[in-house]
Curated annotation (Swiss-Prot):
The active site is at 246, 280 (nucleophile). Catalyzes the oxidation 4-aminobutanal (gamma-aminobutyraldehyde) to 4-aminobutanoate (gamma-aminobutyrate or GABA). This is the second step in one of two pathways for putrescine degradation, where putrescine is converted into 4-aminobutanoate via 4-aminobutanal. Also functions as a 5-aminopentanal dehydrogenase in a a L-lysine degradation pathway to succinate that proceeds via cadaverine, glutarate and L-2-hydroxyglutarate. It is an enzyme of class 1 (oxidoreductase). This is Gamma-aminobutyraldehyde dehydrogenase. It comes from Salmonella paratyphi C (strain RKS4594).
């Protein structure tokens, strides 16, 4: 099992404190890995800064070829990556193989092509006797911090556009789920020039702070919690670094009287509980119009209670464990707080399961009120609440009454209503009669405290570039 760091094209052991990496399905230690020392963080950043002088001047074609080689290598090692991700995260193995690995490969291939397609304002004589042109140039060294819920996929979302644009990257995966990023490092060292891609391991306070605060780091990209985002913004503010933040969500799912209730119930079953609900876009905050509220509660109760929890390697498993014991405790506390409210009905689930591993039963909480914490705060687990609403204006007001602004969905057969709401919902993405669907060609990102900046799409590539004006007098 690959446990070494990648610094300047060489795999090396960490020189810092050793950290245990767990299998959340069993609670057992998989292995111990040594963190990067401050000196190693410095070496990785300096290697990236040195490599940038040449990598930043390579042609888009050359960068695309490297990304395509990495995509091919991931595809060729798909089963090994899937097993590592499943073991380290508790994800059902078949979900990683069938859903995540193909999407990861596609992201690298998309940005390989996108690197060759950047466009801008036409060059011309906007001032007599002077020709102006626009350049989109790479930024420099990018520090990327990946989360623990989709370790390899989020690494791909960060690495692909940054490298495609000509930046050099130092990436730190979560200390909870580092295995696939470290495996990726072993493949990347033979594809990219030394220093272009560096992979470190360690905790935020010991490695992340040193990395993001380094004077040679020009941009920090984070997918994580609001509190982590706030910390990084405060930490990097004195240096005025560019930042790219994706900080979670609490997606409203608005179901009107005319919606296909079977489709909505199946949608919540799938999109609210995929990855054990550990997803920023999870369909977790349901609003049902009064006329169909009771019927939808019943359908959702049946749908959610039918989800099969089990071992990640079992092909029939739909729901795996939460990522860590600490997170299991957070989810349990959030649900217990909700259950203490007299108006909350627990339709199914509501507690962690007995036995080994960090499993929490798929949970549906009915009759939640707009002001309840279970409606307002991100739980990031297999927990869905449902609230009754009366009309379009009320539900729009409630849906937007949130500090989050990442994803939302509207379920209705009324095309006009779908357009009205999608235009007024304060979310980076709104799906109509579906949820959770992502493609490499379309942007993913939020507003409000869900952050700013886009992943995927040409917009994501542009986020990793600088716009410069060149004027020639003649």
């Amino acid at each position: 099992m690959q446990y070494q760091l990648l610094i300047n094209g060489v795999l090396v052991d960490g020189e810092g404190e050793r950290q245990s990496v767990y299998n959340p399905a069993t609670g057992e230690v998989i292995l111990e890995i040594a963190e990067a020392s401050p000196a190693q963080v410095d070496a990785a950043v300096l290697a990236a800064d040195s490599a940038f002088a040449e990598w930043g001047q390579t042609t888009p074609k050359a960068r695309a070829e490297c990304l395509l080689k990495l995509a091919d290598s991931i595809e060729q090692n798909a089963l090994e990556f899937a097993r590592l991700e499943s073991q380290n995260c508790g994800k059902p193995l078949h979900c990683v193989i069938n859903d995540e690995i193909p999407a990861i490969v596609d992201v690298f291939r998309f940005f390989a092509g996108a690197a060759r397609c950047l466009s801008g304002l036409a060059a011309g004589e906007y001032l007599e006797g002077h020709t102006s042109m626009i350049r989109r140039d790479p930024i420099g060294v990018v520090a990327s911090i990946a989360p623990w819920n989709y370790p390899l996929m989020m690494a791909a979302w960060k690495l692909a556009p940054a490298l495609a644009a000509g930046n050099c990257v130092v990436i730190k995966p979560s200390e909870i789920t580092p295995l696939t990023a470290l495996k990726l490092a072993a493949l990347a060292k033979d594809i990219f020039p030394p220093g272009v891609l560096n992979v470190l391991f360690g905790r935020g306070q010991t490695v992340g702070d040193v990395l993001t605060g380094h004077e040679k780091v020009r941009m920090v990209s984070l997918t994580g919690s609001i509190s982590t985002g706030e910390h990084i913004l405060r930490h990097t503010a004195p240096a005025i670094k560019r930042t790219h933040m994706e900080l979670g969500g609490k997606a409203p799912v608005i179901v009107f009287d005319d919606a296909d209730l079977d489709a909505a119930a199946q949608g919540v079953r799938t999109f609210g509980f995929y990855n054990a609900g550990q997803d920023c876009t999870a369909a977790c905050r349901i609003y049902a119009q009064r006329g169909i509220y009771d019927a939808l509660v019943e359908k959702l109760g049946n749908a959610v209670s039918s989800l099969k929890m089990g071992a990640p390697e079992d092909e029939s498993t739909e729901l795996g464990p939460l990522s860590s014991l600490a997170h299991l405790k957070r989810v349990t506390a959030a649900v217990e707080e909700a259950k203490a409210l007299s108006h909350i009905r627990v339709i199914t689930g509501g507690s962690q399961t007995e036995g080994k591993g960090y499993y929490f039963a798929p949970t549906l909480l009915a009759d939640a009120k707009q002001e309840d914490a279970i409606v307002q705060r991100e739980v990031f687990g297999p927990v869905v609440s449902i609230t009754v609403f009366d009309d379009e204006d009320q539900v729009l007001r409630w849906a937007n009454d949130s500090r989050y602004g990442l994803a939302s969905s509207v379920w209705t057969q009324d095309v006009g209503r779908a357009h009205r709401l999608s235009a007024r919902l304060q979310y980076g993405c709104t799906w109509i009669n579906t949820h959770f669907m992502l493609v490499s060609e379309m942007p993913h990102g939020g507003q409000k405290q869900s952050g700013y900046g886009k992943d995927m799409s040409l917009y994501g590539l542009e986020d990793y570039t600088l716009v410069r004006h060149i004027m020639v007098k003649h």
